[in-house]
Amino acid sequence: MDDVIVVTSDYVPGHRIVKILGVTWGLTVRSRGLGGNLVAGLRTIAGGEIKEYVTLLNDARETALQRLISSAKAMGATAVINMRFDTSDMAQAMTEIVAYGTAVVTEPVENSQNVTLS
């Protein structure tokens, strides 16, 4: 079991859930730093996207997601269903990002129809 399937739905297409293992999550707390806050403050005056924060949050979400996958693997999961992200500010210069979902064990269903989104 090398890969854990992660989906935002309550099922995994082409698979049957055979066991629910419970809640799994991965989180990270990131500091925006003084320099980032100064640049962001200047950008808010001019308007537009604050690229420093976009990069920070994208990196933090990826870290939280990888930690969720590691946690699910440690539980013996083959998939995580209903995965969500949640973000909250802590103090003035820190942001917490958590990825969470339900760790499950799945097995492939023979002759299943693949879901195609258009």
Curated annotation (Swiss-Prot):
Coiled coil residues, start to end: none
PANTHER family: UPF0145 PROTEIN SCO3412 (PTHR34068:SF2), UPF0145 PROTEIN YBJQ (PTHR34068)
A Pfam family the protein falls into: YbjQ_1
SUPFAM superfamilies tied to this protein: YbjQ-like
UniProt name for this protein: UPF0145 protein PTO0347
Family: Belongs to the UPF0145 family.
InterPro entries, alphabetized: UPF0145_dom_sf, UPF0145_YbjQ-like
